[in-house]
Protein backbone atom coordinates (compact mmCIF):
# COMPACT_ATOMS: atom_id res chain seq x y z
CA UNK A 1 0.00 0.00 0.00
CA UNK A 2 0.90 3.65 -0.38
CA UNK A 3 0.76 5.19 3.11
CA UNK A 4 -0.05 8.85 3.73
CA UNK A 5 0.08 10.96 6.89
CA UNK A 6 -2.40 13.85 6.84
CA UNK A 7 -2.63 16.70 9.34
CA UNK A 8 -6.40 17.10 9.64
CA UNK A 9 -8.21 20.08 11.19
CA UNK A 10 -11.92 19.12 11.27
CA UNK A 11 -14.75 21.67 11.35
CA UNK A 12 -16.20 22.24 14.85
CA UNK A 13 -18.43 19.33 15.82
CA UNK A 14 -16.87 16.85 13.36
CA UNK A 15 -15.19 13.96 15.26
CA UNK A 16 -11.64 13.10 14.10
CA UNK A 17 -12.65 9.53 13.18
CA UNK A 18 -15.27 10.87 10.78
CA UNK A 19 -12.81 13.39 9.30
CA UNK A 20 -10.14 10.70 8.81
CA UNK A 21 -12.62 8.32 7.18
CA UNK A 22 -13.85 11.13 4.91
CA UNK A 23 -10.28 11.85 3.76
CA UNK A 24 -9.66 8.16 3.01
CA UNK A 25 -12.96 7.78 1.12
CA UNK A 26 -12.81 11.01 -0.91
CA UNK A 27 -9.19 10.40 -2.01
CA UNK A 28 -9.97 6.82 -3.13
CA UNK A 29 -13.31 5.19 -4.11
CA UNK A 30 -15.91 7.22 -2.22
CA UNK A 31 -18.40 9.86 -3.34
CA UNK A 32 -21.05 11.82 -1.42
CA UNK A 33 -23.78 9.17 -1.62
CA UNK A 34 -24.22 5.45 -2.21
CA UNK A 35 -24.37 4.62 -5.93
CA UNK A 36 -25.69 1.49 -7.69
CA UNK A 37 -22.42 0.87 -9.48
CA UNK A 38 -20.68 0.24 -6.14
CA UNK A 39 -22.10 -3.27 -6.45
CA UNK A 40 -20.22 -3.88 -9.69
CA UNK A 41 -16.77 -3.83 -8.10
CA UNK A 42 -15.01 -4.96 -4.94
CA UNK A 43 -14.87 -1.80 -2.86
CA UNK A 44 -13.10 -3.67 -0.07
CA UNK A 45 -10.22 -4.22 -2.44
CA UNK A 46 -9.94 -0.65 -3.71
CA UNK A 47 -10.94 1.72 -0.92
CA UNK A 48 -8.50 3.78 1.11
CA UNK A 49 -8.48 3.04 4.84
CA UNK A 50 -7.74 5.40 7.72
CA UNK A 51 -5.87 3.02 10.04
CA UNK A 52 -4.59 5.29 12.84
CA UNK A 53 -5.36 8.72 14.30
CA UNK A 54 -3.28 10.63 16.84
CA UNK A 55 -3.75 14.17 18.23
CA UNK A 56 -1.04 16.72 17.37
CA UNK A 57 0.75 17.72 20.60
CA UNK A 58 0.33 21.40 21.43
CA UNK A 59 -2.34 22.04 18.78
CA UNK A 60 -6.07 22.11 19.55
CA UNK A 61 -8.32 20.19 17.13
CA UNK A 62 -5.48 18.93 14.93
CA UNK A 63 -4.91 15.24 14.26
CA UNK A 64 -2.48 13.15 12.25
CA UNK A 65 -4.56 10.66 10.27
CA UNK A 66 -2.74 7.75 8.63
CA UNK A 67 -4.35 6.45 5.44
CA UNK A 68 -3.42 3.33 3.41
CA UNK A 69 -4.23 3.26 -0.32
CA UNK A 70 -4.21 -0.03 -2.28
CA UNK A 71 -1.52 0.07 -4.96
CA UNK A 72 -3.97 -0.78 -7.74
CA UNK A 73 -5.48 2.71 -7.43
CA UNK A 74 -2.42 4.26 -9.08
CA UNK A 75 -0.95 4.25 -12.57
CA UNK A 76 2.61 2.95 -12.71
CA UNK A 77 5.33 5.56 -13.21
CA UNK A 78 2.97 8.55 -12.89
CA UNK A 79 3.52 11.09 -10.12
CA UNK A 80 0.71 13.10 -11.73
CA UNK A 81 -1.82 10.32 -11.16
CA UNK A 82 -0.57 9.67 -7.62
CA UNK A 83 -1.13 13.31 -6.64
CA UNK A 84 -4.45 13.58 -8.48
CA UNK A 85 -5.77 10.80 -6.25
CA UNK A 86 -4.16 11.60 -2.91
CA UNK A 87 -4.34 15.42 -2.93
CA UNK A 88 -7.21 15.98 -5.38
CA UNK A 89 -10.76 17.04 -4.42
CA UNK A 90 -10.28 16.07 -0.80
CA UNK A 91 -8.50 19.37 -0.02
CA UNK A 92 -11.71 21.29 -0.71
CA UNK A 93 -13.81 19.07 1.55
CA UNK A 94 -16.37 21.05 3.60
CA UNK A 95 -16.10 18.85 6.71
CA UNK A 96 -12.45 19.95 7.09
CA UNK A 97 -11.19 23.36 8.11
CA UNK A 98 -7.70 22.56 6.85
CA UNK A 99 -5.74 19.57 5.56
CA UNK A 100 -2.05 19.00 5.00
CA UNK A 101 -0.23 16.02 3.52
CA UNK A 102 2.74 15.63 5.87
CA UNK A 103 4.45 12.54 4.45
CA UNK A 104 4.02 9.70 2.01
CA UNK A 105 5.48 6.20 1.84
CA UNK A 106 5.62 4.67 -1.60
CA UNK A 107 6.21 0.87 -1.52
CA UNK A 108 9.24 -0.59 -3.29
CA UNK A 109 7.07 -2.20 -5.98
CA UNK A 110 5.72 1.24 -6.92
CA UNK A 111 9.14 2.96 -6.72
CA UNK A 112 10.44 0.41 -9.23
CA UNK A 113 7.99 1.71 -11.87
CA UNK A 114 9.84 5.06 -11.92
CA UNK A 115 13.10 5.88 -13.70
CA UNK A 116 13.92 8.56 -11.12
CA UNK A 117 16.81 11.01 -11.53
CA UNK A 118 18.39 10.95 -15.01
CA UNK A 119 21.86 10.18 -13.59
CA UNK A 120 22.22 10.60 -9.84
CA UNK A 121 25.02 11.79 -7.57
CA UNK A 122 27.81 9.34 -8.43
CA UNK A 123 27.36 9.57 -12.20
CA UNK A 124 27.31 13.38 -11.98
CA UNK A 125 30.59 13.42 -10.05
CA UNK A 126 32.12 11.09 -12.65
CA UNK A 127 30.92 13.28 -15.53
CA UNK A 128 32.30 16.42 -13.89
CA UNK A 129 35.41 14.78 -12.40
CA UNK A 130 34.83 16.58 -9.08
CA UNK A 131 35.09 14.66 -5.80
CA UNK A 132 35.40 15.20 -2.05
CA UNK A 133 33.71 18.58 -1.76
CA UNK A 134 30.36 20.32 -2.33
CA UNK A 135 29.90 21.83 -5.80
CA UNK A 136 29.73 25.61 -6.15
CA UNK A 137 27.16 27.53 -8.16
CA UNK A 138 25.91 31.05 -8.82
CA UNK A 139 22.60 32.40 -10.09
CA UNK A 140 23.20 35.17 -12.61
CA UNK A 141 21.71 38.49 -11.44
CA UNK A 142 19.91 40.73 -12.23
CA UNK A 143 17.60 37.84 -12.99
CA UNK A 144 15.75 39.73 -15.74
CA UNK A 145 16.81 42.50 -18.13
CA UNK A 146 20.34 41.55 -19.28
CA UNK A 147 21.06 41.03 -22.97
CA UNK A 148 22.28 37.58 -24.01
CA UNK A 149 25.85 38.77 -24.56
CA UNK A 150 26.14 40.52 -21.19
CA UNK A 151 24.55 37.49 -19.57
CA UNK A 152 27.13 35.20 -21.19
CA UNK A 153 29.90 37.50 -20.02
CA UNK A 154 28.75 37.22 -16.40
CA UNK A 155 28.62 33.42 -16.79
CA UNK A 156 32.19 33.36 -18.09
CA UNK A 157 33.53 35.56 -15.28
CA UNK A 158 31.97 33.41 -12.56
CA UNK A 159 33.13 30.10 -14.06
CA UNK A 160 36.59 31.51 -14.76
CA UNK A 161 36.85 32.57 -11.10
CA UNK A 162 36.44 29.01 -9.84
CA UNK A 163 32.75 28.09 -9.68
CA UNK A 164 31.55 24.74 -11.05
CA UNK A 165 28.16 25.97 -12.24
CA UNK A 166 26.24 29.09 -13.08
CA UNK A 167 22.47 29.17 -13.28
CA UNK A 168 19.61 30.73 -15.19
CA UNK A 169 17.14 32.22 -12.77
CA UNK A 170 13.83 30.37 -12.66
CA UNK A 171 12.02 33.28 -14.35
CA UNK A 172 14.43 33.36 -17.30
CA UNK A 173 12.71 31.53 -20.16
CA UNK A 174 12.54 33.38 -23.49
CA UNK A 175 11.61 37.03 -23.00
CA UNK A 176 11.82 39.98 -25.44
CA UNK A 177 15.11 41.23 -23.95
CA UNK A 178 16.80 37.82 -24.25
CA UNK A 179 15.49 34.97 -26.40
CA UNK A 180 16.41 31.48 -25.30
CA UNK A 181 18.45 30.56 -28.37
CA UNK A 182 20.71 33.62 -28.03
CA UNK A 183 21.22 32.93 -24.32
CA UNK A 184 22.08 29.28 -24.94
CA UNK A 185 24.68 30.24 -27.58
CA UNK A 186 26.44 32.89 -25.49
CA UNK A 187 26.41 30.66 -22.39
CA UNK A 188 27.90 27.76 -24.38
CA UNK A 189 30.68 30.08 -25.55
CA UNK A 190 31.31 31.08 -21.92
CA UNK A 191 31.42 27.41 -20.89
CA UNK A 192 34.01 26.40 -23.47
CA UNK A 193 36.18 29.48 -22.87
CA UNK A 194 36.20 29.01 -19.08
CA UNK A 195 36.93 25.27 -19.43
CA UNK A 196 39.89 26.04 -21.68
CA UNK A 197 41.28 28.58 -19.21
CA UNK A 198 40.80 26.58 -16.00
CA UNK A 199 41.16 22.97 -17.12
CA UNK A 200 38.01 22.11 -15.11
CA UNK A 201 34.66 20.89 -16.42
CA UNK A 202 32.05 23.66 -16.13
CA UNK A 203 28.28 23.82 -16.45
CA UNK A 204 25.51 26.38 -16.82
CA UNK A 205 21.92 25.40 -15.97
CA UNK A 206 20.16 26.29 -19.22
CA UNK A 207 16.50 26.77 -18.29
CA UNK A 208 14.46 24.72 -20.76
CA UNK A 209 11.11 25.48 -19.07
CA UNK A 210 8.59 26.61 -21.68
CA UNK A 211 4.89 27.03 -22.36
CA UNK A 212 4.53 23.60 -23.97
CA UNK A 213 6.24 20.23 -23.54
CA UNK A 214 7.25 20.26 -27.21
CA UNK A 215 9.00 23.62 -26.87
CA UNK A 216 10.73 22.48 -23.67
CA UNK A 217 12.13 19.37 -25.37
CA UNK A 218 13.20 21.49 -28.36
CA UNK A 219 15.28 23.67 -26.03
CA UNK A 220 16.80 20.63 -24.33
CA UNK A 221 17.73 19.21 -27.75
CA UNK A 222 19.46 22.49 -28.68
CA UNK A 223 21.36 22.47 -25.36
CA UNK A 224 22.55 18.93 -26.08
CA UNK A 225 23.64 19.91 -29.60
CA UNK A 226 25.73 22.74 -28.12
CA UNK A 227 27.46 20.21 -25.85
CA UNK A 228 26.05 21.68 -22.63
CA UNK A 229 26.26 19.21 -19.71
CA UNK A 230 23.11 20.32 -17.85
CA UNK A 231 19.65 21.81 -18.37
CA UNK A 232 17.12 23.12 -15.90
CA UNK A 233 13.38 22.89 -15.24
CA UNK A 234 10.88 24.58 -12.91
CA UNK A 235 9.11 21.39 -11.90
CA UNK A 236 6.11 22.71 -9.99
CA UNK A 237 5.11 25.46 -12.42
CA UNK A 238 5.99 23.20 -15.38
CA UNK A 239 4.13 20.23 -13.91
CA UNK A 240 5.09 16.64 -13.13
CA UNK A 241 4.15 15.26 -16.55
CA UNK A 242 6.47 17.73 -18.28
CA UNK A 243 9.19 17.08 -15.70
CA UNK A 244 9.10 13.31 -16.14
CA UNK A 245 9.21 13.71 -19.93
CA UNK A 246 12.27 15.95 -19.66
CA UNK A 247 13.96 13.59 -17.17
CA UNK A 248 13.54 10.69 -19.60
CA UNK A 249 15.02 12.79 -22.42
CA UNK A 250 17.96 13.80 -20.21
CA UNK A 251 18.81 10.22 -19.27
CA UNK A 252 18.62 9.06 -22.89
CA UNK A 253 20.88 11.91 -24.03
CA UNK A 254 23.43 12.27 -21.24
CA UNK A 255 22.19 15.61 -19.88
CA UNK A 256 22.10 16.38 -16.16
CA UNK A 257 18.85 17.96 -14.93
CA UNK A 258 18.72 20.80 -12.40
CA UNK A 259 15.34 21.33 -10.76
CA UNK A 260 14.06 24.61 -9.35
CA UNK A 261 11.12 24.53 -6.93
CA UNK A 262 9.46 27.88 -7.81
CA UNK A 263 5.91 27.97 -6.36
CA UNK A 264 6.68 25.48 -3.57
CA UNK A 265 5.95 27.94 -0.74
CA UNK A 266 2.41 28.45 -2.07
CA UNK A 267 1.89 24.73 -1.39
CA UNK A 268 4.08 23.98 1.62
CA UNK A 269 4.58 27.06 3.81
CA UNK A 270 1.42 26.99 5.95
CA UNK A 271 1.75 24.52 8.79
CA UNK A 272 -1.86 23.31 8.78
CA UNK A 273 -2.78 23.25 5.07
CA UNK A 274 -1.15 22.17 1.82
CA UNK A 275 1.60 19.62 1.15
CA UNK A 276 4.87 19.44 3.09
CA UNK A 277 8.00 19.93 0.97
CA UNK A 278 9.31 16.50 1.99
CA UNK A 279 6.45 15.03 -0.08
CA UNK A 280 7.27 17.29 -3.05
CA UNK A 281 10.93 16.23 -2.70
CA UNK A 282 10.02 12.52 -2.74
CA UNK A 283 7.81 13.12 -5.77
CA UNK A 284 10.69 14.86 -7.55
CA UNK A 285 13.04 11.95 -6.89
CA UNK A 286 10.45 9.65 -8.47
CA UNK A 287 9.70 11.99 -11.39
CA UNK A 288 13.37 12.75 -12.07
CA UNK A 289 15.97 15.45 -11.35
CA UNK A 290 19.68 15.47 -10.48
CA UNK A 291 19.61 18.65 -8.35
CA UNK A 292 16.80 20.30 -6.41
CA UNK A 293 16.69 23.47 -4.33
CA UNK A 294 16.18 22.50 -0.71
CA UNK A 295 16.61 25.66 1.37
CA UNK A 296 19.74 26.79 3.21
CA UNK A 297 18.86 26.77 6.95
CA UNK A 298 21.05 29.89 7.25
CA UNK A 299 20.02 32.17 4.35
CA UNK A 300 17.05 34.37 3.42
CA UNK A 301 14.46 31.66 2.66
CA UNK A 302 12.27 29.49 4.91
CA UNK A 303 13.69 26.27 6.37
CA UNK A 304 14.25 24.85 9.87
CA UNK A 305 17.41 22.77 10.33
CA UNK A 306 15.95 19.41 11.44
CA UNK A 307 13.14 19.48 8.89
CA UNK A 308 15.50 20.51 6.09
CA UNK A 309 18.01 17.78 6.93
CA UNK A 310 15.15 15.28 7.04
CA UNK A 311 14.24 15.83 3.41
CA UNK A 312 17.85 16.36 2.32
CA UNK A 313 18.54 12.79 3.46
CA UNK A 314 15.35 11.64 1.73
CA UNK A 315 16.79 13.03 -1.50
CA UNK A 316 20.27 11.51 -1.18
CA UNK A 317 20.10 8.26 0.77
CA UNK A 318 19.00 4.82 -0.35
CA UNK A 319 17.12 3.99 2.85
CA UNK A 320 15.53 6.34 5.40
CA UNK A 321 14.32 5.24 8.83
CA UNK A 322 11.19 6.73 10.37
CA UNK A 323 12.29 9.61 12.60
CA UNK A 324 9.59 11.92 13.91
CA UNK A 325 12.18 14.25 15.45
CA UNK A 326 13.06 15.22 11.86
CA UNK A 327 9.49 15.08 10.59
CA UNK A 328 9.91 11.71 8.84
CA UNK A 329 6.69 9.76 9.42
CA UNK A 330 7.55 6.59 7.48
CA UNK A 331 10.53 4.39 6.70
CA UNK A 332 11.26 4.72 2.97
CA UNK A 333 13.29 2.27 0.88
CA UNK A 334 14.35 3.78 -2.45
CA UNK A 335 15.53 0.42 -3.87
CA UNK A 336 18.59 1.87 -5.61
CA UNK A 337 16.76 4.79 -7.28
CA UNK A 338 19.59 7.32 -7.90
CA UNK A 339 20.01 10.14 -5.38
CA UNK A 340 19.42 13.87 -5.91
CA UNK A 341 21.90 16.60 -4.92
CA UNK A 342 20.29 19.18 -2.60
CA UNK A 343 20.98 22.77 -3.65
CA UNK A 344 21.42 25.41 -0.93
CA UNK A 345 20.59 28.78 -2.46
CA UNK A 346 19.18 32.09 -1.29
CA UNK A 347 20.84 34.88 0.69
CA UNK A 348 24.08 33.06 1.50
CA UNK A 349 27.64 34.43 1.44
CA UNK A 350 31.20 33.50 2.46
CA UNK A 351 30.56 33.74 6.23
CA UNK A 352 27.93 31.02 5.83
CA UNK A 353 30.38 28.62 4.16
CA UNK A 354 31.48 26.69 7.31
CA UNK A 355 27.86 26.17 8.42
CA UNK A 356 26.77 25.10 4.92
CA UNK A 357 29.69 22.67 4.59
CA UNK A 358 28.86 21.16 7.97
CA UNK A 359 25.07 21.00 7.46
CA UNK A 360 24.95 19.70 3.89
CA UNK A 361 28.20 17.72 3.62
CA UNK A 362 29.97 16.90 0.36
CA UNK A 363 26.98 15.76 -1.68
CA UNK A 364 25.40 19.15 -2.24
CA UNK A 365 25.52 22.25 -4.43
CA UNK A 366 26.09 25.58 -2.66
CA UNK A 367 24.79 28.46 -4.74
CA UNK A 368 25.78 32.07 -4.15
CA UNK A 369 24.03 34.56 -6.46
CA UNK A 370 24.35 37.93 -4.77
CA UNK A 371 27.13 36.35 -2.69
CA UNK A 372 29.23 36.11 -5.87
CA UNK A 373 28.02 38.97 -8.08
CA UNK A 374 27.81 41.40 -5.15
CA UNK A 375 31.58 41.32 -4.59
CA UNK A 376 32.96 44.89 -4.65
CA UNK A 377 35.68 43.96 -7.17
CA UNK A 378 33.43 42.17 -9.65
CA UNK A 379 32.12 38.76 -10.62
CA UNK A 380 35.36 36.79 -11.03
CA UNK A 381 36.82 37.92 -7.66
CA UNK A 382 33.45 37.03 -6.09
CA UNK A 383 33.80 33.52 -7.49
CA UNK A 384 37.41 33.31 -6.26
CA UNK A 385 36.32 34.31 -2.74
CA UNK A 386 33.70 31.56 -2.62
CA UNK A 387 36.04 28.89 -3.98
CA UNK A 388 38.80 29.82 -1.51
CA UNK A 389 36.32 29.81 1.39
CA UNK A 390 34.97 26.40 0.37
CA UNK A 391 38.42 24.83 -0.07
CA UNK A 392 39.47 26.23 3.33
CA UNK A 393 36.38 24.76 5.03
CA UNK A 394 36.81 21.34 3.38
CA UNK A 395 40.50 21.24 4.32
CA UNK A 396 39.75 22.26 7.91
CA UNK A 397 37.06 19.60 8.19
CA UNK A 398 39.38 16.95 6.77
CA UNK A 399 41.98 17.95 9.38
CA UNK A 400 39.40 17.27 12.10
CA UNK A 401 38.52 20.84 13.02
CA UNK A 402 34.99 21.68 14.16
CA UNK A 403 33.34 23.88 11.53
CA UNK A 404 30.43 24.79 13.82
CA UNK A 405 32.58 26.39 16.51
CA UNK A 406 35.69 27.42 14.53
CA UNK A 407 33.99 28.51 11.29
CA UNK A 408 34.64 32.25 11.54
CA UNK A 409 38.27 31.64 12.52
CA UNK A 410 38.77 29.32 9.52
CA UNK A 411 37.40 31.99 7.14
CA UNK A 412 39.56 34.71 8.74
CA UNK A 413 42.71 32.59 8.37
CA UNK A 414 41.94 31.88 4.72
CA UNK A 415 41.28 35.57 4.00
CA UNK A 416 44.87 36.42 5.01
CA UNK A 417 46.19 34.85 1.81
CA UNK A 418 43.23 35.71 -0.43
CA UNK A 419 42.55 39.42 -0.94
CA UNK A 420 39.34 38.52 -2.80
CA UNK A 421 38.03 36.63 0.23
CA UNK A 422 39.13 39.41 2.59
CA UNK A 423 37.12 41.94 0.57
CA UNK A 424 34.07 39.65 0.58
CA UNK A 425 34.36 39.17 4.36
CA UNK A 426 34.37 42.92 4.82
CA UNK A 427 31.22 43.48 2.72
CA UNK A 428 29.00 40.77 4.20
CA UNK A 429 30.01 40.64 7.85
CA UNK A 430 26.83 42.34 9.09
CA UNK A 431 24.09 40.73 6.98
CA UNK A 432 21.77 38.34 8.82
CA UNK A 433 18.32 36.94 8.13
CA UNK A 434 16.93 36.17 11.57
CA UNK A 435 13.23 35.37 11.44
CA UNK A 436 11.37 32.47 13.00
CA UNK A 437 10.56 29.67 10.54
CA UNK A 438 6.83 29.28 9.84
CA UNK A 439 6.97 25.52 9.44
CA UNK A 440 8.32 24.00 12.65
CA UNK A 441 8.29 20.53 14.19
CA UNK A 442 5.55 19.67 16.68
CA UNK A 443 6.68 19.80 20.36
CA UNK A 444 6.95 16.09 21.15
CA UNK A 445 6.82 14.42 17.77
CA UNK A 446 9.92 12.28 18.36
CA UNK A 447 8.05 8.98 18.57
UniProtKB/Swiss-Prot annotation:
It comes from Ligustrum vulgare (Common privet). GO terms for biological process: photorespiration; reductive pentose-phosphate cycle. The active site is at residues 141, 260. Heterohexadecamer of 8 large chains and 8 small chains; disulfide-linked. The disulfide link is formed within the large subunit homodimers. Transmembrane segments: none annotated. The modification N6-carboxylysine is found at residue 167. This is Ribulose bisphosphate carboxylase large chain. Keywords: Calvin cycle, Carbon dioxide fixation, Chloroplast, Disulfide bond, Lyase, Magnesium, Metal-binding, Monooxygenase, Oxidoreductase, Photorespiration, Photosynthesis, Plastid. It catalyses: 2 (2R)-3-phosphoglycerate + 2 H(+) = D-ribulose 1,5-bisphosphate + CO2 + H2O; D-ribulose 1,5-bisphosphate + O2 = 2-phosphoglycolate + (2R)-3-phosphoglycerate + 2 H(+). Its cofactor is Mg(2+). One of its GO terms (cellular component) is chloroplast.
Amino acid sequence: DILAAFRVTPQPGVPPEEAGAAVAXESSTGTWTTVWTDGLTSLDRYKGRCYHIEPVPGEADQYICYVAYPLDLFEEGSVTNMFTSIVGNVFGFKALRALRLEDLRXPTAYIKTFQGPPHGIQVERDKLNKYGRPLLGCTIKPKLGLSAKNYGRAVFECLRGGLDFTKDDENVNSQPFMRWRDRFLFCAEALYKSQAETGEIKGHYLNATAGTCEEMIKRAVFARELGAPIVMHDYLTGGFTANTSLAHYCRDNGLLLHIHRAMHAVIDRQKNHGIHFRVLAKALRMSGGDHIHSGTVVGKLEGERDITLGFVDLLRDDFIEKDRSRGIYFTQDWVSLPGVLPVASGGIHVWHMPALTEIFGDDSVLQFGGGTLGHPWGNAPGAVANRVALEACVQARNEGRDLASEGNEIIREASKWSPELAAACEVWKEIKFEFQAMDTLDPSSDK
